[in-house]
Amino acid sequence: MDVTIQHPWFKHALGPFYPSRLFDQFFGQGLFEYDLLPFLSSTISPYYRQTLLRTVLDSCISELMTHRWFVPHQPHAGNPENNPIKVRSDRDKFVIFLDVKHFSPEDLTVKVLEDFVEIHGKHNERQDDHGYISREFHRRYRLPSSVDQSALSCSLSADGMLTFSGPKVQSGLDAGHSERAIPVSQEEKPSSAPLF
């Protein structure tokens, strides 16, 4: 029995004019646009070429992501580890805004250890909409050397925004580095902190 052996390059070289056999029999991969529109296909094997639809989608997505109004998806704010944090260091003040809406002032401890402020929150298991949950987080921030550590303050607003702040001293003055706990005071009004 004579079997004609044809080099696969010969078939692909005539690709646009040569009809494909049952969509090239790539059953597990679905249809490619060159199966439906063979004049758009090239002579490269379908395993190595990128589909036209994929090329168009990639260019559209990259174009959308370059716009200033595009904001990537933020994780759910149920976990304090994922909450947005805002740290500001102006000429005369250092401020940290932290969303801790699931914690009461009794659940929070704020300490200053040398050049760092440590914020720790922990509450025992309690019931919420989905069952029982316990939460805990630990944050540590380096304080600028010019912050007056004797005048640090910390407050928790009614909407759960923790604000840690301290004034900066002029250069040449001692900032008073020591270890001490900062009490968390409860406010009755919502925070005026900027939205994230």
From Swiss-Prot:
Glycans are attached at residue 185. GO terms for biological process: lens development in camera-type eye; negative regulation of apoptotic process; protein refolding; response to heat. Zn(2+) 1 binds at residues 123, 125. It is found in: Cytoplasm; Nucleus. Residues 1-63 are annotated as: Required for complex formation with BFSP1 and BFSP2. Zn(2+) 2 binds at residue 130. This is Alpha-crystallin A chain. It comes from Spalax ehrenbergi (Middle East blind mole rat). The modification N-acetylmethionine is found at residue 1. The gene is CRYAA. Keywords: Acetylation, Chaperone, Cytoplasm, Eye lens protein, Glycoprotein, Metal-binding, Methylation, Nucleus, Phosphoprotein, Zinc. Residues 170-196 are annotated as: Disordered. Belongs to the small heat shock protein (HSP20) family. Contributes to the transparency and refractive index of the lens. Acts as a chaperone, preventing aggregation of various proteins under a wide range of stress conditions. Required for the correct formation of lens intermediate filaments as part of a complex composed of BFSP1, BFSP2 and CRYAA.
